[in-house]
Amino acid sequence: MEEAGLCGLREKADMLCNSESHDILQHQDSNCSATSNKHLLEDEEGRDFITKNRSWVSPVHCTQESRRELPEQEVAPPSGQQALQCNRNKEKVLGKEVLLLMQALNTLSTPEEKLAALCKKYADLGNSPLL
């Protein structure tokens, strides 16, 4: 995957994005004689540039990919570590569920709809094999 190639370069990409935003800010400071509207426009363009060109790679994805790339690290962890890793995986899955639930709740307009969605999700989680 393309994201796996970026894992080792995450810090460098952050530094690059930060340096580009710093260059944009320096450019704004050098044009002090311009009107304030021009500064606002440049500031918005700078934010758009940073937002469009920055992509985040999940640290979880990076660690999983690095384990696949390095076969000598594929030694089975002791049972205590397996239980800990299993709990972490459950937390990650539940965290994603919570995020999706919050996004779904934000799309609903009435409190009744939100309550019904929460009750349905609670029932679904009660039947889930994760718990």
Swiss-Prot record:
Cystine pairs annotated here are: none
Q: Which GO terms describe its molecular function?
A: syntaxin binding
Tissues/organs with expression: Ubiquitously expressed.
**Where are the coiled-coil regions?**
none
Q: According to its UniProt record, which protein family does this protein belong to?
A: Belongs to the taxilin family.
Which PANTHER family does this one have?
Answer: GAMMA-TAXILIN (PTHR16127:SF14), TAXILIN (PTHR16127)
Record's protein name: Putative gamma-taxilin 2
Which lineage is the organism of this entry classified under, starting from the top rank?
Eukaryota, Metazoa, Chordata, Craniata, Vertebrata
